[in-house]
Amino acid sequence: MFLDTAKIKVKAGNGGDGMVAFRREKYVPNGGPWGGDGGRGGNVVFVVDEGLRTLMDFRYNRHFKADSGEKGMTKGMHGRGAEDLRVRVPQGTTVRDAETGKVLTDLIEHGQEFIVAHGGRGGRGNIRFATPKNPAPEISENGEPGQERELQLELKILADVGLVGFPSVGKSTLLSVITSAKPKIGAYHFTTIVPNLGMVRTQSGESFAVADLPGLIEGASQGVGLGTQFLRHIERTRVILHIIDMSASEGRDPYEDYLAINKELESYNLRLMERPQIIVANKMDMPESQENLEEFKKKLSENYDEFEELPAIFPISGLTKQGLATLLDATAELLDKTPEFLLYDESDMEEEAYYGFDEEEKAFEISRDDDATWVLSGEKLMKLFNMTNFDRDESVMKFARQLRGMGVDEALRARGAKDGDLVRIGKFEFEFVD
């Protein structure tokens, strides 16, 4: 089964908790703190594997969770960092943040790696908090929570050339005779319901990848027929071979077919029309094909002002192999002078994929529940909260100082908080002391 979209959830590992411990040895008075740091949580890493062809592996396995780091240990020893969770994806996978829609990365090279969720850092042990004023601190940090996010995956097959056209114009037949691919071929519409990929080698020794894409019909860009299900695969191609049935065996006008398909490509993505097209006049072995071709050329030339450049037309027959060598040589030549097309605007991409906090974002936010409880939230505040060890009084006092330093106390007073009011952070509640 060919699967080219998937929505998954990834969770990086939490950092290990830091430890509170003291050196207790004979003949070592005032041994001091000896608790080590926790280990780093594992990242979730996507790795491109050229052996994969679809996103089928994500159909039944939609949750990926990396291991957490080990806790800090006595004698100042750090906990072991967790191994990264490496997830294999096929070439041509685009990764988006499902919440924002931003493109995180476009994975196109074999072996390429990208961290989609960063593991949390380990919490600090009490060795890190020793000062001249407090040489034996009973303070440690919990490990930082690992990044958690929902991702939308899209597979756009890697092909230099895309074959487009109405159903049953001979795309699959053409692919089968110019490559070793074995697409399903039949005398009915939508015989091809998944993209097929093959490699072409010309007589001069040049090679390129060709994709046979399921047939388009009018309204495909609005979801008619197979809809936009496979239009995305055209986006990676550099050259489009527009296959026209010159025999008009389906009772349609070849020139109207040509205009209709171009309209669907343009409606789906304006940038698709920037790709150079070669018109492939197929089924020239059939009666009336030559007459239809002459009429097609006439209509095309009469309306050439509508096109930036008049496309080349190559008469062929996929059945008899007439004209194939000339077509393939011309395609290879056009590929040589056609650069890669940018798939996404910079505005679509995240400037940098990282796990941190935006300096421009508020450090905290204050709201009030229906029960009159003040609620504190915010990414930075929650990070401090999650890393606080509430089993240790000194850690709690440190957290209170951090809140005061962030201006939380002052902000609560400004909002009207009074002595004894309940304040909630996550599931933790405490009284406000003015």
Curated annotation (Swiss-Prot):
Belongs to the TRAFAC class OBG-HflX-like GTPase superfamily. OBG GTPase family. It is found in: Cytoplasm. Residues 1-158 form the Obg domain. The keyword Hydrolase applies. Keywords: Cytoplasm, GTP-binding, Hydrolase, Magnesium, Metal-binding, Nucleotide-binding. Its EC number is 3.6.5.-. The keyword Metal-binding applies. Pfam families: DUF1967 (PF09269), GTP1_OBG (PF01018), MMR_HSR1 (PF01926). Monomer. GTP binds at residues 165-172, 190-194, 212-215, 282-285, 317-319. GO terms for biological process: ribosome biogenesis. Residues 159-336 form the OBG-type G domain. The gene is obg. It comes from Streptococcus pneumoniae (strain ATCC 700669 / Spain 23F-1). One of its GO terms (cellular component) is cytoplasm. CDD domains: Obg. The lineage of its organism: Bacteria, Bacillati, Bacillota, Bacilli, Lactobacillales. GO terms for molecular function: GTP binding; GTPase activity; magnesium ion binding. Its cofactor is Mg(2+). It is an enzyme of class 3 (hydrolase). An essential GTPase which binds GTP, GDP and possibly (p)ppGpp with moderate affinity, with high nucleotide exchange rates and a fairly low GTP hydrolysis rate. Plays a role in control of the cell cycle, stress response, ribosome biogenesis and in those bacteria that undergo differentiation, in morphogenesis control. Residues 356-434 form the OCT domain. Mg(2+) binds at S172, T192. This is GTPase Obg.
